Swiss-Prot record:
It is a multi-pass membrane protein. This is Adrenocorticotropic hormone receptor. Residues 50-58, 127-147, 200-217, 279-297 are cytoplasmic. InterPro entries: ACTH_rcpt (IPR001168), GPCR_Rhodpsn (IPR000276), GPCR_Rhodpsn_7TM (IPR017452), Melcrt_ACTH_rcpt (IPR001671). Belongs to the G-protein coupled receptor 1 family. The lineage of its organism: Eukaryota, Metazoa, Chordata, Craniata, Vertebrata. Its main location: membrane. Ubiquitinated by MGRN1 that may be involved in post-endocytic trafficking and/or degradation of internalized receptor.
Length: 297
């Protein structure tokens, strides 16, 4: 969130002067290239699901929700780069009303990306839980109508919360709320995993009779979750350090890696579609047909 970063900019500069860690600066071209690839890859995921009737199931709709979150994160960086280019060329007045409004909109996309990813992964975890332990009732519990309602509620909440967080981004409670959502999501999914493990021990025979695809979906979720944590945790930690120890040289040393942490977030959007393709033969076939312009709908 740019507003949060800017509010601590002077303090961080002072802290860096007391630190031996130089600030790591990455070329904007790297961010721009990764972001473009992320948008294109996730756009292919969305088109594959909506053009292929065989993929129009609740699980794939939840994956589309995660793909939209990833795409918003990539789009955020693209628009930010365009804004910087226009400002450097003199087309925008620095700190002007238009740039401030544009910054707010772009920052909303970033927050929306994180919130969307958190809730999409959570609902995918719940879906996998139902698939494994309520397999016979799955289609009566997870209907398309309920899926649409759940996703509508999630994105309505994320949009409202994202806009609110950007408006009040200078306030510490907003930062705490922003960063607390990350561990809360992990706790929720961890509770599901623990419960799944305990039930699996008492229902070993029942679990062994489940279709392999059900268990494969749970493994896919684990991979997606691991990648999400790896890519987003450094940035969340950065925001926490910037809030609670901005002048500390050790905190400043970690914060010197801000652009590296930002690049990891962009990489998340690029990695996820490869996970879908690697773990799902249906999506992999759909991707191949789309890339080679085959007619399959």
């Amino acid at each position: 969130m740019k507003h949060i970063i800017n509010s601590y900019e002077n303090i961080n500069n002072t802290a860096r002067n007391n630190s031996d860690c130089p600030r790591v600066v990455l070329p904007e071209e790297i961010f721009f290239t990764i972001s473009i690839v992320g948008v294109l890859e996730n756009l292919i995921v969305l088109l594959a699901v909506f053009k292929n009737k065989n993929l129009q199931a609740p699980m794939y709709f939840f994956i589309c929700s995660l793909a939209i979150s990833d795409m918003l994160g990539s789009l955020y960086k693209i628009l930010e780069n365009i804004l910087i280019i226009l400002r450097n060329m003199g087309y925008l007045k620095p700190r002007g009303s238009f740039e401030t409004t544009a910054d707010d909109i772009i920052d909303s996309l970033f927050v929306l990306s994180l919130l969307g990813s958190i809730f999409s992964l959570s609902v995918i975890a719940a879906d996998r839980y139902i698939t494994i332990f309520h397999a016979l009732r799955y289609h009566s519990i997870v209907t398309m109508r309920r899926t649409v309602v759940v996703l509508t509620v999630i994105w309505t909440f994320c949009t409202g919360t994202g806009i609110t967080m950007v408006i009040f981004s200078h306030h510490v409670p907003t930062v705490i709320t922003f960063t607390s959502l990350f561990p809360l999501m992990l706790v929720f999914i961890l509770c599901l995993y623990v419960h799944m493990f305990l039930l699996a021990r008492s229902h070993t025979r029942k679990i062994s009779t489940l279709p392999r695809a059900n268990m494969k979906g749970a493994i896919t979720l684990t991979i997606l979750l691991g990648v999400f944590i790896f890519c987003w945790a450094p940035f969340v930690l950065h925001v926490l350090l910037m809030t609670f120890c901005p002048s500390n040289p050790y905190c400043a040393c970690y914060m010197s890696l801000f652009q590296v942490n930002g690049m990891l977030i962009m990489c998340n959007a690029v990695i996820d579609p490869f996970i879908y393709a690697f773990r799902s033969p249906e999506l992999r076939d759909a991707f191949k047909k789309m890339i080679f312009c085959s007619r399959y709908w």
